[in-house]
């Protein structure tokens, strides 16, 4: 008998082939006497299908596992929505890179059978949260699995800000912004900005400057439990934004303080038993694959 009896399904909605994959997934689950629970918007895209559905934010109340059909962006959105539930998440890749979505849509049964027999690898990925204070009052907040990014928003101007770690002054920086990335996010935007790749199991964060005016400003790897404080200097003529996984933007103002910390809990990510992070890097990043001893 499967360890999972009710499986929530979240999917990207803009591609017909994704709905085809969802239908195949539902048939697979029902054949195994596992009840699928569709996210509400997905359910509206599949008229005539008689299965349970739920609002995204409440999906974790109705299932003991969630499957995401889409790419890394879909997975990130799902992670933020269900992160307060202690349920595992599995990704079926219908995107491009697919660092977080391991299962091929072309081999569903072959790749899912072992997982529903309990033959899988599970790892915990932590998340981070940002809280913006304006004149010591809350102004906005957001969470991220990949990264929180301070950027100019709609303006092409550089930003000047002060950076503090655990209340110790680090630097005053003038740049296009700052990426604060988790190990999960180290292979995303932070990597393209010159940051290092971090193993997913590391309890660390990387701070990556974006086009700093001082060329000696380099990425810094810090303890994941450190308290980061960014003060947007009063001299700025623009209102920068804080982006959460590139999907949610919060506007900051000159004088605002941005507090970034590790979020309690996290995401339980399911991988196939043979999952290998270095193999994923070779495949997704185009590393040389031949071994020459």
UniProtKB/Swiss-Prot annotation:
Q: Which InterPro entries is this protein grouped with? A: ATP-NAD_kinase_N, ATP-NAD_kinase_PpnK-typ_C, NAD/diacylglycerol_kinase_sf, NADK
Q: So where does NAD(+) get bound?
A: 72-73, 146-147, 157, 174, 176, 187-192, 247
Xref: SUPFAM superfamilies: NAD kinase/diacylglycerol kinase-like
Uppermost EC category: transferase
Keywords, ordered alphabetically: ATP-binding, Cytoplasm, Kinase, NAD, NADP, Nucleotide-binding, Transferase
**Disulphide-bonded residues:** none
In the UniProt record, does the keyword Zinc occur? no
One biological process term from GO is: NADP biosynthetic process
**Where does it sit, as one GO cellular component term?**
cytoplasm
What are the recorded GO MF terms, alphabetically? ATP binding; metal ion binding; NAD binding; NAD+ kinase activity
Cross-referenced Pfam families, in alphabetical order? NAD_kinase (PF01513), NAD_kinase_C (PF20143)
Under HAMAP family, the record lists: NAD_kinase
Tell me which family the UniProt entry assigns to this protein: Belongs to the NAD kinase family.
This protein is called NAD kinase
Q: Which species is this UniProt entry from?
A: Marinomonas sp. (strain MWYL1)
Q: Which gene encodes it?
A: nadK
């Amino acid at each position: 008998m499967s360890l999972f009896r009710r499986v929530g399904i979240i999917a990207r909605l803009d591609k017909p082939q994704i709905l085809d994959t969802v239908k195949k997934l539902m048939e697979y689950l029902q054949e195994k006497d596992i009840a699928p629970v569709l996210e509400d918007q997905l359910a509206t895209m599949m008229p005539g299908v008689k299965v349970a559905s739920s609002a995204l934010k409440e999906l974790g109340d109705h299932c003991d596992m969630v499957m995401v059909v889409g790419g890394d962006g879909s997975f990130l959105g799902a992670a933020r929505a269900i992160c307060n539930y202690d349920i595992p998440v599995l990704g079926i890749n219908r995107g491009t890179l697919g660092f977080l979505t391991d299962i091929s849509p072309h081999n569903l049964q072959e790749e899912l059978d072992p997982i529903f027999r309990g033959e899988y690898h599970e790892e915990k990925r932590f998340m981070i949260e940002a809280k913006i204070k304006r004149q010591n009052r809350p102004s906005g907040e957001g969470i991220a699995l990949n990264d929180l990014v301070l950027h100019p928003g709609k303006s092409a101007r550089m930003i000047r800000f002060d950076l503090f770690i655990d209340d110790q002054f680090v630097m005053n920086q003038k740049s296009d912004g700052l990426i604060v990335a988790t190990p999960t996010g180290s292979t995303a935007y932070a990597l393209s900005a010159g940051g290092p790749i971090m193993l997913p199991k590391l309890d660390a964060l990387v701070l990556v400057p974006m086009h700093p005016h001082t060329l000696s400003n380099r990425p810094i790897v810090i303890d994941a439990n450190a308290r980061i404080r960014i003060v947007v200097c009063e001299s700025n003529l623009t209102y920068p934004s804080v982006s959460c996984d590139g999907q949610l933007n919060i506007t900051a103002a000159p004088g605002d303080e941005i507090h970034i910390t590790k979020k309690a809990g996290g995401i339980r990510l399911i991988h196939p038993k043979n999952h290998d992070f270095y193999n994923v890097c070779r495949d997704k990043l185009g590393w040389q694959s031949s071994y020459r001893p």
